[in-house]
């Protein structure tokens, strides 16, 4: 099947990674997607519903490769027990950057599609931005008795009813971090908490489902 799609430059990613990349937005009103239209870009991304095998086949015929599967989940917000989390401060940024850099080294921004350190740098910047209230609105942390950070979660308000988890990590602290996220959403009057993770991250999927989440959708990321 032919693919109709617009091509949009990824301005922020291009500046951050130093690449010339774009993303295709598939829509029936757009022109046909052709190799000539894709040629000016060194990297082109596409995100499609995992159930849409027609688009998957068509994009692969245009030279796209499957990079990652994504699962989006949602759970109802309730007032969970207090986890003892506190709001991260700017003094926590160096430690958080180091933790996020190590925890998210194998995302869709990995080699060979991007530089070997690209994924680590991207998520280190993400968590710093969350502390500063840029993109994600806040970062909450759990501290060990020593004062070291043992877990963190970033969160963003989407609209009047929904909030979304950005990054969540902390060995053995998953249940507490989910309580933290639910309390944050509850305090802001939200009814739904959303979170996405890689299809292959079974530990995260189990944690979210154990916390009451249901799968809402699945998607594939493809690159050319």
Curated annotation (Swiss-Prot):
The record's listing under InterPro entries reads: AcTrfase_WecD, Acyl_CoA_acyltransferase, Ankyrin_rpt, Bact_Acetyltransf, GNAT_dom
Question: Where acetyl-CoA is bound, by residue?
Answer: 168-174, 201, 207
Residue ranges of the TM segments: none
- Which residues does the Swiss-Prot or TrEMBL record annotate as the active site? 208 (proton donor)
This protein's pathway: Bacterial outer membrane biogenesis; enterobacterial common antigen biosynthesis
Q: Name one GO molecular function term.
A: N-acetyltransferase activity
* Tree of life domain: Bacteria
Domain (N-acetyltransferase): give its ranges. Answer: 94-224
User: What catalytic activity does the UniProt entry give for this protein?
Assistant: dTDP-4-amino-4,6-dideoxy-alpha-D-galactose + acetyl-CoA = dTDP-4-acetamido-4,6-dideoxy-alpha-D-galactose + CoA + H(+)
Q: Name one Pfam family in it.
A: Acetyltransf_1
Output the GO biological process annotations, alphabetical, semicolon-separated: enterobacterial common antigen biosynthetic process
Q: Does the keyword Repressor apply?
A: no
- What's in the keyword line of the UniProt record? Acyltransferase, Transferase
| Enzyme Commission number(s) | 2.3.1.210
> Does the record bear Ribosomal protein in its keywords?
no
Record family assignment? Belongs to the WecD family.
Quaternary structure and partners = Homodimer.
Function statement: Catalyzes the acetylation of dTDP-fucosamine (dTDP-4-amino-4,6-dideoxy-D-galactose) to dTDP-Fuc4NAc, which is utilized in the biosynthesis of the enterobacterial common antigen (ECA).
Name of the protein in its database record: dTDP-fucosamine acetyltransferase
């Amino acid at each position: 099947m032919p693919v109709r799609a617009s091509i949009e430059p990824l301005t922020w990613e291009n500046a951050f990674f130093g690449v010339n990349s774009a993303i295709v937005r598939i829509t029936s009103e757009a022109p046909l997607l052709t190799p000539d239209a894709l040629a000016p870009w060194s990297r082109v991304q596409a995100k499609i519903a995992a159930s849409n095998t027609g688009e998957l086949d068509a994009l692969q015929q245009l030279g796209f490769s499957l990079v990652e599967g994504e699962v989006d989940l949602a759970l109802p917000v309730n007032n969970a027990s207090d986890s003892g989390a506190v709001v991260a401060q700017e003094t926590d940024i160096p430690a958080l950057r180091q933790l996020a850099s190590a925890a998210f080294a194998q995302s869709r921004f990995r080699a060979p599609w991007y530089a070997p350190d690209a994924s680590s740098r991207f998520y280190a910047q993400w968590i710093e931005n969350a502390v500063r209230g840029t993109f994600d609105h806040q970062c909450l942390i759990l501290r060990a008795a020593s004062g070291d950070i043992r877990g963190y979660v970033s969160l963003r308000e989407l609209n009047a009813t929904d909030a979304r988890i950005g990054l969540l990590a902390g060995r053995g602290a998953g249940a507490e971090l989910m309580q933290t996220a639910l309390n944050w959403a509850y305090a802001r009057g939200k009814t739904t908490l959303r979170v996405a993770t890689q299809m292959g991250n079974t530990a995260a999927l189990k944690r979210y489902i154990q916390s009451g989440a249901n799968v809402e959708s699945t998607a594939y990321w493809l690159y050319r």
